[in-house]
């Protein structure tokens, strides 16, 4: 059975939002203290390339894998078909698994963990309230306000699922 991939590379040609930059910060923070110079790391789903470029600037040997050749990954491959040809210290997939069927995530991680010596880092979106940001600027006064409204459905058309949406619980994710 061939599954549908929901992704788009259109967003990588635009400037990122504050929330997207915060996401990068959280990705790096998650790896802080675990990933060191000269470590090897596989990144599946490279997005804009920020994380891999940052890690390379810190002398981490990064192998990038993405389904979208326009993003110029080291290897063009669907995550379900990628099998590392050697062992790596770390693996990361940030905001990737929600773009495929939930059940595929387990087989991908099982496939990868055989070749990872240290850590697997993953992040997925959490189904929560939708933030509405307002920015007010009057002369020298500036104020940013965020208001959260209840979210009733997945808004991103490229997501199959999000954590805590319907039966996609943390418990199910960790099993």
Describe each model-derived feature in a short phrase:
Residues 100-111, 124:
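A short, conserved alpha-helix within the catalytic core of class I
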């Amino acid at each position: 059975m061939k599954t549908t991939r929901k992704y788009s590379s259109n967003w990588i040609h635009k400037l990122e939002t504050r929330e997207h930059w915060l996401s990068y910060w959280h990705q790096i923070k998650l790896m802080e203290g675990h990933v060191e110079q000269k470590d090897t790391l596989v990144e599946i789903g490279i997005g804009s390339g920020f994380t891999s470029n940052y890690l390379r600037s810190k002398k981490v040997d990064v192998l990038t894998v993405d389904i979208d050749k326009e993003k110029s990954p080291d290897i063009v491959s669907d995550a379900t078909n990628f099998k590392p040809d050697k062992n790596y210290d770390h693996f990361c997939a940030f905001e990737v698994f929600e773009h495929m069927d939930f059940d595929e995530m387990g087989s991908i991680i099982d496939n990868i963990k055989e070749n990872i010596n240290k850590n697997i880092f993953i992040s997925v979106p959490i189904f929560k309230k939708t933030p509405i940001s307002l920015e007010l600027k009057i002369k020298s006064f500036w104020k940013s306000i965020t208001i959260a409204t209840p979210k009733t459905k997945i808004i991103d058309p490229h997501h199959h699922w999000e954590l805590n949406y319907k039966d996609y619980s943390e418990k199910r994710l960790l099993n």
